[in-house]
């Protein structure tokens, strides 16, 4: 019988596939960025995934988030992903957590159990706290910078936080990371200047998260 990862094994070899199967990766934020990361991880054969997000699928997610469909509308994203992962690789172990990671909730996580951490959160204080906790535990981490109001997918690159430019989120991260003693941090960011938007949005944009501190969401698309 053909193994579903047969073509992946051609590239990584049996030992590489075994490492992926034994790996435990935590993805913090499973929206536009984190969602595609989860998809790639499960299709590559990663054995255990921790999904951390307290958001539910909403209408404005449909333009870019892989988990967003009319069928998943209103569901917690981590729950919808758990079901999707099971349909792709039933042997994968999934730990969905309906919680917003931040300085107030960070103590609820044991980072020593992770082999790798992906930061796809959009809150600066949470991103910095995540970087601090991962580095304290000696766990590799990559942090996603801003993709809102961007149109050029070729402008993205992986580099160190302190080598970034242009990105407003990276600028804010640099300031806070220096204060927390973070000397280096692998990030993916875009060299493209953010656009201002060609037209106002139809209807209310900020539907992803309710409560105080709501802000106008940036423009987004499925290819950046």
Which residues does each predicted region cover?
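Hydrophobic/small residue at the entry helix of a nucleotide-binding pocket
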Residues: 33-34
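Short, well-ordered coil/turn residues at beta-beta hairpins
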Residues: 120-121, 144
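Conserved SAM/SAH-binding loop
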Residues: 97-106
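N-terminal charged helix/coil linker that caps or initiates catalytic domains
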Residues: 1-26
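Glycine-rich phosphate/adenylate-binding loop
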Residues: 109-113, 125-129, 136, 141, ...
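Conserved N-terminal Rossmann-fold NAD(P)-binding element of oxidoreductases
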Residues: 27-29, 52
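Glycine-rich phosphate-binding loop and adjoining beta1-alpha1-beta2 segment
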Residues: 46, 51-89
């Amino acid at each position: 019988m053909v193994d579903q990862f047969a073509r992946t094994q051609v590239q990584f070899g049996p030992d590489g596939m075994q490492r992926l199967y034994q790996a435990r990766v935590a993805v913090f934020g499973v929206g536009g960025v984190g969602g595609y990361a989860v998809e790639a991880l499960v299709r590559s054969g990663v054995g255990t995934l921790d999904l951390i997000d307290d958001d539910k699928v909403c209408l404005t997610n449909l333009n870019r988030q892989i988990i967003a469909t009319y069928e998943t509308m209103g569901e917690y994203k981590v729950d919808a992903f758990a079901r999707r992962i099971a349909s792709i690789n039933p042997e994968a172990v999934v730990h969905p957590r309906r919680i917003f990671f931040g300085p107030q909730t960070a103590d609820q996580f044991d980072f020593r159990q992770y082999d790798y951490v992906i930061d796809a959160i959009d809150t600066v204080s949470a991103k910095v706290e995540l970087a601090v906790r991962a580095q304290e535990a000696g766990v590799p981490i990559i942090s996603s910078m801003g993709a809102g109001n961007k149109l050029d997918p070729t402008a993205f690159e992986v580099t160190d936080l302190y080598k970034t430019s242009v990105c407003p989120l990276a600028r804010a991260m640099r300031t806070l990371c220096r204060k927390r003693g973070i000397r280096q941090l692998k990030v993916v960011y875009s060299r493209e200047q953010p656009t201002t938007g060609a037209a106002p949005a139809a209807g209310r944009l900020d539907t992803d998260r309710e409560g105080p501190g709501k802000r106008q969401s940036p423009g987004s698309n499925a290819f950046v």
